[in-house]
UniProtKB/Swiss-Prot annotation:
MF terms in GO: rRNA binding; structural constituent of ribosome
Record keywords: Ribonucleoprotein, Ribosomal protein, RNA-binding, rRNA-binding
Protein name in UniProt: Large ribosomal subunit protein bL21
SUPFAM superfamilies assigned to the protein according to its UniProt record, in alphabetical order: L21p-like (SSF141091)
The UniProt record lists the keyword Ribosomal protein: yes
Organism from which the protein derives: Prochlorococcus marinus (strain MIT 9303)
Example of a GO biological process term: translation
Family: Belongs to the bacterial ribosomal protein bL21 family.
Amino acid sequence: MAEKPAAKPKAAAAKAEAKDQSDSYAIVEASGQQFWLQPNRYYDLDRLQAAVDDTVTLENVLLIKDGKNDTTVGQPYVKGASVELKVMDHRRGPKIIVYKMRPKKKTRRKNGHRQELTRVMVQSISIDGKALS
């Protein structure tokens, strides 16, 4: 039987580095909700008062985990931690239908709305000025 060639060390190191970056995340508080943010991914938040292509910094970081199994939990916030976001687009969410009906009566009310959202891309997660990603 032929033996399989050994994996290249450069490829293994690059794969491990990519895994480290994908394992880093931050949990932040924005617009009254908590969001799990990872670098180089986009998320839809409630409408932010920022123009497209602006950079927004979130300081209310509740938890940071880097790819090296180091987790920092804030009480309530992590000191010196921030998440930098880039505003990609302002959009509207899907239509939500609210239907209220009273049984055995002729009372029916149908309302609906679309939530105003801002799509942001996570640029970097940093703690004490040092970027994790």
